[in-house]
Amino acid sequence: MINWQVIAQLVSLGVIVLVGPAVIILLSLKRGNL
């Protein structure tokens, strides 16, 4: 059996880890341009 809850948690963690820094970089770039 596949534990979908564990997979969902891992995917959400991966998305947060990947998207978090990207959002911070984009915000810093936008503030720098303004």
UniProtKB/Swiss-Prot annotation:
It is found in: Plastid, Chloroplast thylakoid membrane. Keywords: Chloroplast, Membrane, Photosynthesis, Photosystem II, Plastid, Thylakoid, Transmembrane, Transmembrane helix. GO terms for cellular component: chloroplast thylakoid membrane; photosystem II. The chain crosses the membrane at residues 6-26. InterPro entries: PSII_Ycf12_core-subunit (IPR010284). GO terms for biological process: photosynthesis. It is a single-pass membrane protein. NCBIfam families: PRK13686.1 (NF010239). PSII is composed of 1 copy each of membrane proteins PsbA, PsbB, PsbC, PsbD, PsbE, PsbF, PsbH, PsbI, PsbJ, PsbK, PsbL, PsbM, PsbT, PsbX, PsbY, PsbZ, Psb30/Ycf12, peripheral proteins of the oxygen-evolving complex and a large number of cofactors. It forms dimeric complexes. A core subunit of photosystem II (PSII), probably helps stabilize the reaction center. Belongs to the Psb30/Ycf12 family. This is Photosystem II reaction center protein Psb30.
